[in-house]
Amino acid sequence: MIPESYIESWRTHVSWQTLAMVEQDMVISRALINLYNHPKIQDSLIFRGGTALNKLIIVPPSRYSEDIDFVQRRSEPIGETIDAIRNVLDPWLGDPKRKLTERSAKLVYQYAAINNLPSKLKVEINTTEHFQVLPPFKVLYSMDSDWFKGSCTIMTHELEELLATKLRALYQRRKGRDLFDLWFVFSRKLADIDNVIKIFHKYCKNDGIAITKDIFHSNMVQKRLNKDFQVDMNVLL
């Protein structure tokens, strides 16, 4: 989709394993700028997850990210937000596959990457968790390449709240990337771990669950033996 020379030039920003991964990074960057220049997205969605960490906080990014994850700021019908997303992404990514569940809305855009390799961009919105501990945080974001130039203001969480939701994800699923993201930030002393844990417990309370240190430790011992957890990071560095 993007000329190879433009992708090669973008390697100065990200040094991923393949040109297709570099191209995906460019697609994500442009998509974010398109999205957050739409007033409905700016008002309704908070950008979070590993891609948010590596696009907005960790510079240069510590690992490859492939999806865009949002959460709604408030409880409201998702239809108008989906229309806004499609309004800015469909013109250059085509019609997406859509999946609506009780907890989320997903749009999957498929495109031909470099060398005609099939690729996709998944945009997922958590439509049930209308909860934040700290006020939303605004970050200026820009892209400057021969393929696309633009800027926007992205609504996200404060770093310690992003990490608290990462800590919850580490407990809930079997993806080594969650552990890697937490290790990367804490090993560089970029955040206060005690504050992260306090926010984590507030999310647990909102979810109606109690996770003690022993329960979390047992969960991690089991994950260490899981093959999917062990190999999750293989292609992301």
Where are these regions (language model features)?
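Structured mid-to-C-terminal alpha-helical surface segments
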Residues: 1-45, 56-63, 68, 72-237
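Glycine-rich beta-strand-to-loop/alpha-helix junction loops that act as flexible
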Residues: 47-52
